[in-house]
């Protein structure tokens, strides 16, 4: 518990990065860690980039970290993984939703969606890529993709003393608790299959 660990959550507005950061923060605080978190919303309401930083350890002095300092990056959209790759340390783990959201310029044909996002990450970092959006749709609600991806990254946190399933159950709204627990479990299984 002496070392401070850092996680960067990135995605597009509305994908649920902030809920993941709340789940993480709740779990770490219950386990006795000092936790700090920071959110950058940008143009989130217009489909813009969103990033959240979560840091935990015995004593954390600030919520923000710089380039090359994230131990884990969770990307809810694969192009966002590449966009924020410079924040991941060389020994870090990238957990990526194998899903593309096309911006207005890409949808209009003015730009092309970049090819090989996941492959680019795999060349430089330990990478766990899972089809979180597809699995969430199979579970009945695409909005649970974020919790599914959280399940996929859970083992990378290195905190086996935390009952993350219980933390998810206590953090998500009651009306979607069972769906999110299914998503969490599916994420853990998908990560095992992706390794």
What label would you give each PLM region?
Residues 1-195:
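Active-site cofactor/cluster-binding pocket
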